[in-house]
């Protein structure tokens, strides 16, 4: 069995996440794919959400969760398939899942795409409604166009951000990989946010922002994306005192 996957959070549409799977078997096989929305999210201090509500229809899954501080997070997703299958609901506590059962033929790949929209009360008063609208737009656009837009957006970003080092390809790759993370977590979508000490990859500081941002990250954005540098400084000004 060969599984090829792509997944990306859109650089130019911060609420959209896209996934694609291509599965090929070299034998006649009964195959089951389970996918959905997992609300059973924990951090090192315990469950991340205190309340969950979910819904499903023929094409979509949706879930809204509430944190201990009263913020709400809404996720709406839709699966698109290019093969005949039997769809079954799969119930688990705190999870909304769909089960797709099919028969594959040898060396005939099948494809599945999943488009997801995510909103919070930091973005809108009614995050579930806004996530639904955003998903409608991205479904109409389709995975292929989203992928093309993602590629174009990153190519444009790298025109001003890429670092070239003569004679040390490993160092150049490592440095640009770090810059990729900086560009990925930059708060482009709103005024007065910053970058947490662990970025998007750790829980230890629960999103806390230290002076590390100004000491180690600000210069990069000053030269590559001044609007982000301004946002980082506005956050600091807004939170002084």
Question: Residue locations for each model-derived region?
Answer:
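Acidic/polar, glycine-enriched structural segments that form the non-catalytic walls/loops
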Residues: 1-205
